[in-house]
């Protein structure tokens, strides 16, 4: 079985790198060792290292576990909360009288 190749756009990679750096800084500010955070999050030390590097191959659940250990899980809820583009698209559809199609089962 061949390994699946993941293509990451440069902007996406920068965002992930920044997220990883922010997580690492939060850990260091709390004076928590990587070993302690990994243990409390129930993940391996290499997985935490990958998270702190912004790896796209780590599950979003693992990112959330680390954020919980650091007391930052509420930040996770802010992702896509204010969907400005989605609201504009919805308003544009309402203004033109378009309706959302219902799926018929």
Spans of model-derived segments:
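A short, Lys/Arg-rich alpha-helix, primarily the initiator
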Residues: 5-29
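Short basic helix-loop element that most often maps to the first helix and adjoining turn
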Residues: 21-36, 97-104
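Short alpha-helical DNA-recognition segment
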Residues: 31-49
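Short, basic-rich loop-to-helix N-cap that marks the start of a DNA-contacting helix
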Residues: 55-67
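Short, charged recognition helix plus adjacent turn
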Residues: 77-105
């Amino acid at each position: 079985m061949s390994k699946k190749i993941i293509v990451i756009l440069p902007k996406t990679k920068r965002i992930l790198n920044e997220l990883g750096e922010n997580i690492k800084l939060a850990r260091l500010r709390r004076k928590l060792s990587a070993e302690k955070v990994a243990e409390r999050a129930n993940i391996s030390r290499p997985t935490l290292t990958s998270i702190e590097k912004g790896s796209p191959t780590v599950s979003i659940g693992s990112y959330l576990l680390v954020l919980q250990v650091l007391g930052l899980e509420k930040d996770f809820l802010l992702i896509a909360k204010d969907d400005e583009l989605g609201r504009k698209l919805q308003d544009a559809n309402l203004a033109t009288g378009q309706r959302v199609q219902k799926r018929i089962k």
